[in-house]
A protein has these predicted regions:
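A broad, structure-centric signal for solvent-exposed, well-ordered loop/edge residues
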Residues: 11, 32-35, 114, 130, ...
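Alpha-helical protein-protein interaction/assembly modules
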Residues: 45, 49-60, 72-161, 209-218
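Eukaryote-biased feature marking scaffold/signaling PDZ-domain proteins and nuclear chromatin regulators
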Residues: 18-20, 28-31, 57, 69, ...
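Canonical BTB/POZ domain core
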Residues: 1-88
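Generic recognition of well-structured, leucine-rich alpha-helical segments
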Residues: 7-11, 39-43, 66-69, 81, ...
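Alpha-helical recognition domains of nuclear gene-regulatory proteins
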Residues: 3, 7, 39, 62-68, ...
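Basic helix-extension-helix modules of the SAP/HeH family
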Residues: 154-217
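Extracellular interaction modules
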Residues: 30-34, 133-138, 191-192
Length: 218
């Protein structure tokens, strides 16, 4: 809630109007903003209306707005809904562009996994969206490297709960987020950001263990 107020205040900082003035965010859908406020006050999450196209558009709008205002928990919830209910070949290219634009690691991984396993179906089922995707050279290269290198076969299985530095590059997004959340670390960001964050934690923890052992030896 404070983050939303911060943006609202910053958007009016150059205005000389008094504190009772109304701030209009023309590019924010009123119903979507209501969903975000309801989540912040009550914890209620948006529900699907069983109209696939309408539901998809609504969920994407909520995700974009939640990301804009820093409502991370809602953003991650909606991201998981998009992966579970809307990730099909005909929507993969569009969702990949969305995920890349708004740093949605789980959605991005899911769309790239789908491409890796059903590349021709993804391309042929929606040529218009695939054409848009091809305009993003960096993302296209990333997708091809991902699909051709076998990187989509991430594993969450390690001998211990946290894994070692060497294990981390093989974790999928869900595994990374679970471990980060366990220690109250930030779970938002790209997969590379999550990996760096978890490696930093492991290194810091290893240093603490070494320090304790050194003191014992003395």
């Amino acid at each position: 809630y404070e983050l939303i107020l911060t943006e609202l205040e910053s958007s009016s900082s150059s205005s000389s109007e008094n504190n009772n003035s109304i701030i209009i965010l023309a590019d924010v859908d009123e119903k979507v903003f209501e969903v975000i406020l309801r989540f912040l006050y009550t914890g209620d999450v948006p529900t699907l209306k069983k109209d696939e196209d309408d539901d998809e558009d609504t969920m994407k709008s909520i995700l974009i707005t939640a990301n804009r205002f820093g409502v991370t928990e809602l953003k991650l919830y909606v991201e998981s809904v998009l992966v579970e209910y809307f990730l099909i070949p005909s929507r993969a290219a569009k969702l990949l562009l969305l995920a890349d634009s708004h740093i949605c690691a789980l959605l991005k991984e899911g769309t790239m996994d789908l491409y890796a396993s059903k590349s021709m179906e993804v391309i042929e089922s929606n040529m218009e969206e695939w054409t848009k995707l091809k305009k993003s050279n960096n993302l296209l290269v990333e997708l091809f490297v991902y699909a051709s290198s076998g990187r989509h076969k991430y594993s969450s299985v390690v001998e211990d709960g946290n894994g070692t530095i060497d294990d981390v590059d093989g974790f999928d997004v869900t595994s990374l987020r679970e471990r980060l959340q366990k220690y109250d670390l930030d779970v938002d960001g790209s997969r590379d950001m999550l990996i760096d964050r978890w490696k930093m934690y492991l290194r810091a923890n290893d240093n603490k263990v070494e320090e304790v052992e050194f003191k014992k030896e003395r």
